[in-house]
Amino acid sequence: MAAATAPKTMPSSVFAAALLLLAAAACQASPYYPLELGYYRYTCPQAEAIVKASMEKAIAQNPGNGAAVIRMLFHDCFVEGCDASVLLDPTPFSPTPEKLAAPNNPSLRGFELIDAIKDALEAACPGVVSCADIIAFAARDASCFLSQGKVSFDMPSGRLDGTFSNASESVKFLVPPTSNLSDLASSFAVKGMSLEDLVVLSGAHTVGRSHCSSFVSDRLDVPSDINPALAAFLRTRCPPNTTTSDDPTVMQDVVTPNAMDIQYYKNVLSHTVLFTSDAALLTSPETAKLVLDNAKIPGWWEDKFEKAMVKMASLEVKTGHQGQVRKNCRAINHY
């Protein structure tokens, strides 16, 4: 019998290079960790298609449905992370959840739409798809439909639903539309979001409606930079003193009200935006340049918006034992 030969050793330089390649491959394989693309490919392969079909129908009926779920994603993710806590109804043990907070009530919409999508998913794959992922998928699809496909991106999933919701947290993390740039930037920085993310995500104000109470006091009742013609128009639509029973809504973008496009940035430049928080983007050289770039460079905003949406939808997600998959998006499971 021939003597066994000793195995050849790998040169240290080759071994080190191999480790680097493995590390690079690992990073490339899971850029959205702890989320992943195609999370439901085995457990509910039709999940994303069900959400997409539901959103297509809802937006065809009313484009405002798309704007509502895009806003809902922001209001969910900035408070306790992307965990569908904004969907929870009040209970005797939690009488003031996020949805009753001033930033959400009565302006946040889309709850019934999410309920309908959840019902469809429960019929297809009971107990599998989280409400948090439904919001994320719905916002992704709304962006695509409202932009006529110009905003199109993959949304990683695997979020779990939270079990805590308190209105005070919404007030803490969702700054009002009367905010200046410093307050806006601080609210984004706390969440690890950049000044560019702030400017890019503000572009979602190109769709949807706003209650008059969100801008009358600081844009119409006092001197502001708002375009005089727009101010005159708004005064025909908004009472000088809004109340809970007299608080009409107006389009945020009167030029292309139902299109996800760069018109918002053109409106900022022409001082035809509703909110102080929108006008504030022109109060620093850095953000003013970003506004101009988004308004002028073809495809620039769409690309940045796609990346910022995924980044926002990955904030403080709950996985593993941190959450649950709710059976009803409005209530936590009781086992």
Swiss-Prot record:
Residues the record lists as binding Ca(2+) 2: 206, 253, 256, 261
Leader peptide range in chain numbering: 1-29
Chain positions recorded as heme b binding sites: 205
Active-site residues, Swiss-Prot/TrEMBL: 75
Sorted UniProt keywords: Calcium, Disulfide bond, Glycoprotein, Heme, Hydrogen peroxide, Iron, Metal-binding, Oxidoreductase, Peroxidase, Secreted, Signal
Top-rank taxon, per record: Eukaryota
Main location: secreted
Functional summary from the UniProt entry: Removal of H(2)O(2), oxidation of toxic reductants, biosynthesis and degradation of lignin, suberization, auxin catabolism, response to environmental stresses such as wounding, pathogen attack and oxidative stress. These functions might be dependent on each isozyme/isoform in each plant tissue.
Name the UniProt record assigns to this protein: Peroxidase 2
Organism, scientific name: Zea mays
Taxonomic lineage from the root: Eukaryota, Viridiplantae, Streptophyta, Embryophyta, Tracheophyta
